[in-house]
Amino acid sequence: MKHKLDVTINELRLKSIRKIVKRINTWGDEVKSYSDDALKQKTIEFKERLASGVDTLDTLLPEAYAVAREASWRVLGMYPKEVQLIGAIVLHEGNIAEMQTGEGKTLTATMPLYLNALSGKGTYLITTNDYLAKRDFEEMQPLYEWLGLTASLGFVDIVDYEYQKGEKRNLYEHDIIYTTNGRLGFDYLIDNLADSAEGKFLPQLNYGIIDEVDSIILDAAQTPLVISGAPRLQSNLFHIVKEFVDTLIEDVHFKMKKTKKEIWLLNQGIEAAQSYFNVEDLYSEQAMVLVRNINLALRAQYLFESNVDYFVYNGDIVLIDRITGRMLPGTKLQAGLHQAIEAKEGMEVSTDKSVMATITFQNLFKLFESFSGMTATGKLGESEFFDLYSKIVVQVPTDKAIQRIDEPDKVFRSVDEKNIAMIHDIVELHETGRPVLLITRTAEAAEYFSKVLFQMDIPNNLLIAQNVAKEAQMIAEAGQIGSMTVATSMAGRGTDIKLGEGVEALGGLAVIIHEHMENSRVDRQLRGRSGRQGDPGSSCIYISLDDYLVKRWSDSNLAENNQLYSLDAQRLSQSNLFNRKVKQIVVKAQRISEEQGVKAREMANEFEKSISIQRDLVYEERNRVLEIDDAENQDFKALAKDVFEMFVNEEKVLTKSRVVEYIYQNLSFQFNKDVACVNFKDKQAVVTFLLEQFEKQLALNRKNMQSAYYYNIFVQKVFLKAIDSCWLEQVDYLQQLKASVNQRQNGQRNAIFEYHRVALDSFEVMTRNIKKRMVKNICQSMITFDKEGMPVIHFP
């Protein structure tokens, strides 16, 4: 019933969209007769009509899409089909276009990008990796330039490239920017650490199209982008605590829920820790560092698996994206967890650095005025797209009917039996000359099968999501006669597999999937590697009771599973009941995995709310400071009055010595100690006196400046220094707080409530500290000039 309702709703949406397609086609007939110059002139005309208010982007859409479509034919030799027009309309409306593999998402995106770039505001195409961003940019740039728009790649494609001053601004000063989610996120954070208006480079986040949108804003939604700062004061307990944790026994000393990534000490574990470390009360304030390290060691030891969550590679811990299987070099777990894993692996513990700035992809894309996305598997995530982002998913029809045959799962008792049968099937397929793509969950499994196939004299290409450009080329060749490719689930994603000559007659590409993934969307993406644009093909998933999905997520009765496992092999092969039972177990395990993924993203979203609100407020304040252009005539008296009232109210007893000390520490190094006229019992009199000292010091500082221009720079810098130093402390504190709250409490609601309560308290403390540091900085900072006459500010 639900499926029928979904189909009906989708058809109603398509019916409305097709009316716009008809108008595009009508305009298309007209613009075909235009000369090249006349067609190019339409871009200028569109901009003028938008600027004058004659048209909006919505009213321009049919004509603008027709122009972009015709230009695409003249420049690229590609004429967008009606299904691509449907996708392009969905994208402009700010929704999710589900378009199958090979349906031309890259070309589809050019029309909404062209339309939205006419506004002169920031327009972005965001994809998952540098290779895809560069490939699509280079392919489509000639179209935009022919139409009179500028386009750029939002980064320099050189490893470890160091950007020169102003270079980032030049990259972003274009109508359309192609980039990746990671690079855009880090650029946003860097942009908001700028110490001058000239140092900012990121244009408005107005409109964006996200390729592989489910991968970025669902699967990776809770991934934090982190800019690290100074090293933290580091514990030396990592290795010692690891040795203690090795002595603990599950269900005796500790309990864990692997599905929820939760682990905690039981009473016997607490007693063992107190005895081992000779502490009287493990949860006393004095032992909190020890408790934190024990919790980290437990999580590292039991909740993070080698070759599943991370690799040990060249002496480093390299994280793995569990959904995509792709390695994440340079990415580190926060709050000491990375160091705990290093200790687990017997490695030298690296330095844990404080967090300067952070944002999740979820909150990054919520900064856009409007964004949309493309994916082949949007419908399966529709409820989450709507709940988190208020986006609907429209299933765009394929240009040609899908001919791929998705075979029923092949069921086996053990992984060994499964592997033997799977290799047998691969050999049979390979002997016919049919290309085969074998997909595994892990790089370790891919390497194993690649070696086995080589031993059987079947040459193969191995793709384990390490070299994106090389793998894109290899995956593109996976449709040739006799081709054998072994890959992880993410390797080569975004590249179409085109069938070689004669392959269609053999039945197309055969996709063999070693096991169900933790998410049904990924399963569907993998099946979709075959059967592009109406090509023939097939897919089949092989399952067993030994599969990772079953072992990690199944909540079936263990005795029942063991009973199934021990059945006679002869009976198994003839048992439809067995097949159904195993399929039920696998499907249920996958559903639990997906539900836990949704809950984890919801939880991360809840935790992120505090820092997101605080970050927005702090960045707004920074921007206000950067906009100061007349500091000489600004009145900072109200700011100082707030700070001095804080001081007098925080002091239980005001004395002459305390006030003099405060002046030396915060206002002037040259105070003459003349306080005879001050009544220290009258708090308001003390505030008035401090204001007089503040204004004297401010006037002296202004006098020492060479010009109003330099004074303006001085004020901006000292205020930014106050904001940034306090904000960096707050960000790092919130990261530590989130980790500690999660460790202290298993009840999610309580953990979230506790986090937000403490986060709000700490934010209020931070805002007071910012004001205090602003006053201190503007009074006690010094400005000197170097040999070139440039100002150098020395902060107190």
Curated annotation (Swiss-Prot):
Its main location: membrane. It is a peripheral membrane protein. The keyword RNA-binding does not apply. GO terms for molecular function: ATP binding; protein-exporting ATPase activity. It is an enzyme of class 7 (translocase). GO terms for biological process: intracellular protein transmembrane transport; protein import; protein targeting; protein transport by the Sec complex. It comes from the Bacteria. It is found in: Cell membrane; Cytoplasm. SMART domains: SecA_DEAD, SecA_PP_bind. Pfam families: P-loop_SecA, SecA_DEAD, SecA_PP_bind, SecA_SW. Its EC number is 7.4.2.8. SUPFAM superfamilies: Helical scaffold and wing domains of SecA, P-loop containing nucleoside triphosphate hydrolases, Pre-protein crosslinking domain of SecA. GO terms for cellular component: cell envelope Sec protein transport complex; cytosol; plasma membrane. NCBIfam families: PRK09200.1, secA2. Part of the Sec protein translocase complex. Interacts with the SecYEG preprotein conducting channel. Has a central role in coupling the hydrolysis of ATP to the transfer of proteins into and across the cell membrane, serving as an ATP-driven molecular motor driving the stepwise translocation of polypeptide chains across the membrane. Monomer and homodimer. Part of the essential Sec protein translocation apparatus which comprises SecA, SecYEG and auxiliary proteins SecDF. Other proteins may also be involved. This is Protein translocase subunit SecA 2. The gene is secA2.
